């Protein structure tokens, strides 16, 4: 069996907003990687045994005291190192060069001129003019390298940043001031592939079929002959987990589909048809609407709502597991960004933005052990795994749906009346997006219930009824997103249908906030 983790890249995180994007680009090249904090110890580094190391960007200034530095072991390991933006600057400083505060900051598109030949950039070019080669790149920096360490040559330059790239081919140390991980750097993919496949000499072992084979072996070794219980929601992550576990352990898997009253339109019937009827998976359907709504009654705080929903799910799983003779494991659809975002990152000094349903709301006294076969994967990788396992395209590429469901799309207190109203509004919005061919042109779209009343007119009568907001965004990575510029006539159609077909709604609004500063979900 191929060890798909053997040839791997280590990404040391200095707090960049793009760090996860670096990891996704490495995975796309077919090589496993992990993100670790910048202050990894020499022992941890040796144990991880990477084939190469990438130093991420970051918001700090190398010129300030007490700012993050890479472990010295990084430069003593005898393996290739690529420093990106801040990573290049700390590499230069730590190896004897100098970093200075730039007189002119560079943010956004830039054209860099290639300079000295080197193994990283040779043959990679966007434009040639008068015998010179140029790259179109994305910059985001204030400081710059003013003096390179001994043994380095300048590989790229701009008018305001004379050393926009540097290289020491003998030691295989490379620094670039721009960001190859973002799509605005047109040759970024080629550059990263050059570093990983050629300079680090990594094979492309991280493929969907290999990941599935490895996951099956790991699952079988982990759970043995025990039974596994999985909370099946119908979302992408839990659906892929169900298909993967069913392939690995067959009837040892029992899925519990909890109808909590906070699901999408007809979602329960669709889940049962797909998994129980078509795939032969054992699925127990639990009607728990009254249970959930009872516990949520009177609670308006979003974080508390998430915790209530998470804990209630676990209580139900525990109860169902107690009915199964051998059930010792709870399977979850936790994915890699869940793990990263739910950790209080010391590199970015980040607050936990939201407690993820999968990893942030589990009680300490939970009786079941966890099995999380997607924990190493990004969302795009999960989708590829789903297709490889034979799940339908429309299910695999369905828009994301939060674990707490409509509970975090109803602002404030959750009531059955609100959930029923929102479910119908959301259904109309999604139905019309599909009919107009716009569903897959948006990354995520949904309706939000606002617990405020607005005046409306029906016939000659005034009425005060609720407001629904529509939200649709376009994004590549869900870390940043822009609001989707849907046609006005389309929005008019959706608004008209919602107001005319759903009792209790008098007004429909469209959310035109981007992320940041807003988040995609309202709670």
UniProtKB/Swiss-Prot annotation:
HAMAP family referenced in this protein's UniProt entry, alphabetically: GMP_synthase
Entry's Gene Ontology molecular function annotations: ATP binding; GMP synthase activity
GMPS ATP-PPase domain span: 206-398
Record protein name field: GMP synthase [glutamine-hydrolyzing]
Function statement: Catalyzes the synthesis of GMP from XMP.
Organism: Alcanivorax borkumensis (strain ATCC 700651 / DSM 11573 / NCIMB 13689 / SK2)
Gene3D superfamilies in the record: 3.30.300.10, 3.40.50.880, HUPs (3.40.50.620)
Residues binding ATP: 233-239
Domain of life: Bacteria
Any one GO cellular component localisation term in the record: cytosol
Catalytic site positions: 85, 179, 181
Subunit structure, as described in the record: Homodimer.
Cited Pfam families: GATase, GMP_synt_C, NAD_synthase
Catalytic activity reported: XMP + L-glutamine + ATP + H2O = GMP + L-glutamate + AMP + diphosphate + 2 H(+)
InterPro entries to which the protein is assigned, alphabetical: Class_I_gatase-like, GATASE, GMP_synth_C, GMP_synth_GATase, GMP_synthase, GMPS_ATP_PPase_dom, NAD/GMP_synthase, Rossmann-like_a/b/a_fold
Enzyme Commission identifier(s): 6.3.5.2
Glutamine amidotransferase type-1 domain mapped to chain residues: 8-205
CDD domains on file: GATase1_GMP_Synthase (cd01742), GMP_synthase_C (cd01997)
Keywords: ATP-binding, Glutamine amidotransferase, GMP biosynthesis, Ligase, Nucleotide-binding, Purine biosynthesis
Enzyme class, UniProt record, top EC level: ligase
Pathway(s) the chain acts in: Purine metabolism; GMP biosynthesis; GMP from XMP (L-Gln route): step 1/1
């Amino acid at each position: 069996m191929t060890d798909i983790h053997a040839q791997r890249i280590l990404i040391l995180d200095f707090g960049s907003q793009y760090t996860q994007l670096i990891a996704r680009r490495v995975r796309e090249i077919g090589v496993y990687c992990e993100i670790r904090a910048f202050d990894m110890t020499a022992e941890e580094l040796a144990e991880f045994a990477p084939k190469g190391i990438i130093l991420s960007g970051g918001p700090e200034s190398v010129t300030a005291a007490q700012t993050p530095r890479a472990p010295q072991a990084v430069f003593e390991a005898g393996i290739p190192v690529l420093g990106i933006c801040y990573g290049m600057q700390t590499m230069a400083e730590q190896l004897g060069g100098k970093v200075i505060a730039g007189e002119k900051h560079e943010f956004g598109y830039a054209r860099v001129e290639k300079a000295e030949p080197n193994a990283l950039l040779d043959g990679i070019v966007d434009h040639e003019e008068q015998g010179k080669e140029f790259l179109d790149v994305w910059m985001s920096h204030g400081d710059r390298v003013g003096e390179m360490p001994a043994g380095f040559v300048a590989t790229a330059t701009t008018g305001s940043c004379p050393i926009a790239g540097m290289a020491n081919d003998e030691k295989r140390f490379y620094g670039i001031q721009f960001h190859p991980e973002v799509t605005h750097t047109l040759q970024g993919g080629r550059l990263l592939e050059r570093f990983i496949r050629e300079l680090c000499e990594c094979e492309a072992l991280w493929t969907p079929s290999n990941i599935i084979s490895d996951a099956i072996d790991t699952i079988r070794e982990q759970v043995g002959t025990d039974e596994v219980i999985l909370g099946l929601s119908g979302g992408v992550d839990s659906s892929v987990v169900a298909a993967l576990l069913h392939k690995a352990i067959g009837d040892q898997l029992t899925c519990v589909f909890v109808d909590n009253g906070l699901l999408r339109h007809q979602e329960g019937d669709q889940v049962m048809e797909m998994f129980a009827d078509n795939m032969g998976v054992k699925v127990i359907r639990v009607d728990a609407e009254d249970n959930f709504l009872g516990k949520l009654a009177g609670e308006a705080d979003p974080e508390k709502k998430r915790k209530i929903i998470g804990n209630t799910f676990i209580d139900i799983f525990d109860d169902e597991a107690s009915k199964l003779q051998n059930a010792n494991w709870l399977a979850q659809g936790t994915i890699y960004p869940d793990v990263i975002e739910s950790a209080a990152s010391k590199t970015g000094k980040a607050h936990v933005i939201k407690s993820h349903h999968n990893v942030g709301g589990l009680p300490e006294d939970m009786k079941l052990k966890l099995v999380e076969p997607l924990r190493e994967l990004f969302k795009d990788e999960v989708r590829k795994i789903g297709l490889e396992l034979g799940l339908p395209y429309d299910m695999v590429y369905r828009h994301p749906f939060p674990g707490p469901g409509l509970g975090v799309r109803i602002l404030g207190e959750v009531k059955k009346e609100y959930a029923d109203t929102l479910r119908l509004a959301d259904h109309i919005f999604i139905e019309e997006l599909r009919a107009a061919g716009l569903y897959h042109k948006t990354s995520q779209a949904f309706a939000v219930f606002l617990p405020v009343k607005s005046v409306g007119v029906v016939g000659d009568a005034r009425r005060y009824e609720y407001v629904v907001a529509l939200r649709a965004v376009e994004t590549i990575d869900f870390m940043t997103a822009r609001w989707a510029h849907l046609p006005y006539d389309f929005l008019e159609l959706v608004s008209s249908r919602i107001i005319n077909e759903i009792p209790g709604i008098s007004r429909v609004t469209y959310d035109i906030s981007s992320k940041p500063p807003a988040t995609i979900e309202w709670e």
